[in-house]
Amino acid sequence: MTKRDLHNEGGDENKPRKKQKSEKQKKEKSAKSKSSAEQSLSYVQSPALGDVPQSEIEKFLTENSIKITDTSSENVMRPIISFSHLPPCKDDLYAPLSSFKSPTSIQSATWPLLFAGRDVIGIAETGSGKTLAFGLPCLKKIQDSAMTKQKPYRPLAVIISPTRELAMQIYDQLLKFSGSVGVRVACVFGGVRKEEQREALKTAGVVVATPGRLKDLQNDGSVDLGKVKYLVLDEADRMLDKGFEQDIKDIIRPMPVSKRQTIMFTATWPPSVRDLASTFMSSPVTVTIGGDPSADPRANTRIKQVVEVVKPHEKESRLVQLLNRSQRGVPEPEKVLAFCLYKKEAMRIERLLRTKGFKVAGIHGDLSQQERFRSLDAFKTGAATVLVATDVAARGLDIPSVKQVINVTFPLTVEDYVHRIGRTGRAGAEGHAVTLFTETDKAQSGALINVLRAAKQDIPEDLLKFGTTVKKKQHDAYGAFFKNVDTDKTATKIVFDD
């Protein structure tokens, strides 16, 4: 479906109709822009934030690598650098913030914009506090609008995430804040029965969902999205990678345009995500934390990266040696996340470590939803100190206090490598990542070397021997010959000579 079709289900049977639809879209976009401008007037900067010297604001933005791009306004809103700078709220919405020292970079930069009702694109690494960045303004918006009691099966806010685990994580975080404002939150995802989810949707003001299950519930009439005022697409790049673009378009189609605030969070900024943003968002403000998101992937500089070049048959014994060092003979065993490439490999490694006496749990595609939750819970509580995972756990999961990531097998792309090791070194902490690299991975050596150099990490001579050439990026289905094509562009007429 093209951008033109988003609010035009009737097709292009004739020219006048197409023109009429185009004019309607312009009116909708104009109404949306007007609505955003009016909403921005509702945010009043706190006097305490206004008293902060401009030099201190600029220093904060520079030190935290924050870039704010607003093409529709020359006046950039000041970041909320302290919880005391938050706008006034009813009840005890901010009470749970007492367990945090200060806002994260993404929260500081996006909160003023989101409280003002602007559409926002947030580009930041995982583990940066994105859930509260979009969650707090969402709950405050519902609270301020006195819409805590809405009609059955008609949520006011929808948050879409790529995985069940991430959806549950967002849900758990929102529950800590939603009770004080009387907003019910529902979480819907695949792999479990729909009956309980339908019951939860009846009274939910906020719905956290994976795209596949939400579309199913939407199609069978279990939820009406016609009153949604607040839409969040979390980890948009990951959802597109997983093939959810059409599902997302179908989900958004019935939502109002002029009164909807849309927020998109992503770790990368490829053309596919840019196209999605231009389709659903109106004059969004882009907030980037870190370097250029369209450039080569960069690892968190707080993570110490170690690459060991080994023979394939040496990987398992080396893994056991590394775990012996962090799990045995120490006052408190460290939490270690061990990544495998395929689920069969993960199952084999999990069995091996269990026979060696390690407290281990696993998370991969062959496990039921309940088994995956049990594994994650065991790892979070310390009942298991080693979690063996496939890349299903590589993005978005907030597992606190992970001291070390071990890549038993190198992933298919260096982007996945960066996301994997990003499970450690979160929330300002130091992290450690060990990668067991073999000759079968040599096609990725050049890209890996670039990541190591960018983070000023040591590069082993054995890795340099594989070469520094970076393999051309390929599309999953179309290989190296893939290129992005504007599907809205009129086709060129080709005439052949006789």
UniProtKB/Swiss-Prot annotation:
Keywords: ATP-binding, Helicase, Hydrolase, Nucleotide-binding, Nucleus, Ribosome biogenesis, RNA-binding, rRNA processing. It catalyses: ATP + H2O = ADP + phosphate + H(+). InterPro entries: DEAD/DEAH_box_helicase_dom, Helicase_ATP-bd, Helicase_C-like, P-loop_NTPase, RNA-helicase_DEAD-box_CS. One of its GO terms (biological process) is endonucleolytic cleavage in ITS1 upstream of 5.8S rRNA from tricistronic rRNA transcript (SSU-rRNA, 5.8S rRNA, LSU-rRNA). The Q motif is unique to and characteristic of the DEAD box family of RNA helicases and controls ATP binding and hydrolysis. PROSITE patterns: DEAD_ATP_HELICASE, HELICASE_ATP_BIND_1, HELICASE_CTER. CDD domains: DEADc (cd00268), SF2_C_DEAD (cd18787). This is ATP-dependent RNA helicase dbp3. Residues 111-287 form the Helicase ATP-binding domain. The keyword Nucleus applies. The lineage of its organism: Eukaryota, Fungi, Dikarya, Ascomycota, Pezizomycotina. Its main location: nucleus. Residues 318-467 form the Helicase C-terminal domain. It is found in: Nucleus, Nucleolus. A motif (Q motif) lies at residues 99-107. Residues 1-47 are annotated as: Disordered.
